[in-house]
Amino acid sequence: MAILGLGTDIVEIARIEAVISRSGERLARRVLSDNEWDIWETHQQPVRFLAKRFAVKEAAAKAFGTGIRNGLAFNQFEVFNDELGKPRLRLWGEALILAEKLGVAHMHVTLADERHYACATVILES
């Protein structure tokens, strides 16, 4: 196994809150998958939830070396928790096609947040 990509992102939670205040649900609709949206709608801390998901997806896009462009969209990356609560990443559409093309066999996700920031790291492994 070899490391194919590494990406890290940090998000200021207040910036996400400001965008939501200005544009309502537009950012959440653009960033979240349908499954994540369902959780976001009833989450006790929706801004923090969205900030953490945004950080993971930005980190994943960096790990793939593409950013969010050329057919890749935030909602093609879905963050979920396994049975132990560990964050995991599921891919859809162009993101899945790219992962298969690059030979990605494992994706490792770490996620942390404090009062003002959320950060994530994604490692892609063959």
UniProtKB/Swiss-Prot annotation:
Its main location: cytoplasm. The keyword Ribonucleoprotein does not apply. Transmembrane segments: none annotated. It holds the Pfam family ACPS. GO terms for biological process: fatty acid biosynthetic process. Its cofactor is Mg(2+). It is found in: Cytoplasm. InterPro entries: 4-PPantetheinyl_Trfase_dom, 4-PPantetheinyl_Trfase_dom_sf, ACPS, Ppantetheine-prot_Trfase_dom. One of its GO terms (cellular component) is cytoplasm. It comes from the Bacteria. Mg(2+) binds at residues 9, 58. Signal peptide: none annotated. Belongs to the P-Pant transferase superfamily. AcpS family. NCBIfam families: acpS, pantethn_trn. This is Holo-[acyl-carrier-protein] synthase. The gene is acpS.
